[in-house]
Amino acid sequence: MATNNANYRIKTIKDGCTAEELFRGDGLTYNDFIILPGFIDFGAADVNISGQFTKRIRLHIPIVSSPMDTITENEMAKTMALMGGVGVLHNNCTVERQVEMVKSVKAYRNGFISKPKSVPPNTPISNIIRIKEEKGISGILVTENGDPHGKLLGIVCTKDIDYVKNKDTPVSAVMTRREKMTVERAPIQLEEAMDVLNRSRYGYLPIVNENDEVVNLCSRRDAVRARDYPHSTLDKSGRLICAAATSTRPEDKRRVAALADVGVDVLVLDSSQGNTIYQIAFIKWVKSTYPHLEVVAGNVVTQDQAKNLIDAGADGIRIGMGSGSICITQEVLACGRPQGTAVYKVAQYCASRGVPCTADGGLRQVGDICKALAIGANCAMLGGMLSGTTETPGEYFFKGGVRLKVYRGMGSLEAMSQGKESGKRYLSENEAVQVAQGVSGNVVDKGSAAKLIAYVSKGLQQSAQDIGEISFDAIREKMYAGQVLFSRRSPTAQGEGGVHSLHSYEKKLFAAKM
């Protein structure tokens, strides 16, 4: 049966064009072509849509939120990582502000807490209240000497101190004592520890050694998040993966040092034209100074641009120049490339070098994301599609009875006046006259980004199913082998492929049972 199915997959009749033939002539974008269907012998739920973001980081959902100041701050970055993607924190702010955002993301979901907050038994309750307010934690370990890895005596939680009137009372008088606590002995796997927490009624699970000394700690909050978001993008310690943008000027080395200190996982070098001596030198410096950090370089639209950045040590490449919905680089500067052609050409070269690439710009709907992944991109970066969601920065406002949010390009005059870093992206931060390469506008409230990403995920699975492949890795492999076929679309065909011939209609993209 399997052999017969394999035979059904092989395209023996040349009906359509290969990707190489499709992109041989004029520059194309996503709406200019369509993917031809293949043979289906599996369910959509079986499709693996995961993609490589950098050499070492793979995303369960190959979606990255753009480092724009109206798209990605800590709330969006948390949501993206929880859902299985990753968010790139914008850098149009002070170093200190960006560092705080990274800390917020990294602290949102812990695996093992290696240095849990601990106090000695004579600590007054007033100190516990202060620590809880400053750190935002509800449970504090009590150890023999206050050392995070000292002998465990007990734990003090909010319920233990809420009704104690004398705030000078020592925690030893109100804490839950060691003999009444649920603990586990090291070594233990994180999944086992989370399972114990799920089955117990306690908020925290200390892990101790044979001397009853604290090794680390697990919290119920993190166990619940692990249960509710089983495909989260995590680091080796079980914390959410976090990426952050930076420019490539010498003074940006201080920003990188500060980000590295608080545990950022990926640096995204943010430039509209990445093939510069500044970025090449910056990549080399980062990889030699912080070899554990992954570096995504760009933006590029040609193979030569990508080659220079990969030669410098880039762990990932970002593709796109002037194709975003709020970007006017191509019309103002007459420089760029149609995004479909850019993705195919650059991704082809990146694949030959074993470096993942991310398509950035021109993605208006799930079909565009599918096309980008099918012609070579490993991941897709979203800005406009995520704009107006609850997790984006900024407040909603009403105009004409419609609930809106601001969405602007980082090359807009508004963004460049907000912070110097936006100007650095376009190599114009010190210019007396700044040429806008983006616009600012308003977008309609789209609800939760979590629901939108879930919709994108399901849409990608169904797209791959129609193409007839079990994963996008398989689609790309077959595409390069000429076994995934395409067709050009005329303007009339594009109109035919959309909604037409109706007096009126309401376009709902998904119905969420969440």
From Swiss-Prot:
Keyword set, alphabetical order: CBS domain, Glycosome, GMP biosynthesis, Metal-binding, NAD, Oxidoreductase, Peroxisome, Potassium, Purine biosynthesis, Repeat
Instruction: List the subcellular locations.
Output: Glycosome
Per its record, the protein catalyses: IMP + NAD(+) + H2O = XMP + NADH + H(+)
Q: Which HAMAP family match?
A: IMPDH
Coiled-coil ranges per the record? none
Q: In which pathway does it act?
A: Purine metabolism; XMP biosynthesis via de novo pathway; XMP from IMP: step 1/1
Q: Which family does it belong to?
A: Belongs to the IMPDH/GMPR family.
Q: Which Gene3D superfamilies match?
A: Aldolase class I
What does the entry list as the binding residues for NAD(+)?
D270, S271, S272, G320, M321, G322
The CBS domain is annotated at: 112-171, 175-233
For K(+), which residues are the binding ones?
A: G322, G324, C327, E496, G497, G498
What PROSITE patterns would the database entry show?
A: CBS, IMP_DH_GMP_RED
Q: What is its EC number?
A: 1.1.1.205
The protein, known as: Inosine-5'-monophosphate dehydrogenase
Which cofactors, if any, are listed as required? K(+)
How would you summarize its activity regulation? Mycophenolic acid (MPA) is a non-competitive inhibitor that prevents formation of the closed enzyme conformation by binding to the same site as the amobile flap. In contrast, mizoribine monophosphate (MZP) is a competitive inhibitor that induces the closed conformation. MPA is a potent inhibitor of mammalian IMPDHs but a poor inhibitor of the bacterial enzymes. MZP is a more potent inhibitor of bacterial IMPDH. Potently inhibited by MPA. Inhibited by XMP and GMP.
Please give the subunit comment from the record: Heterotetramer. Interacts with glycosomal protein sorting receptor PEX5.
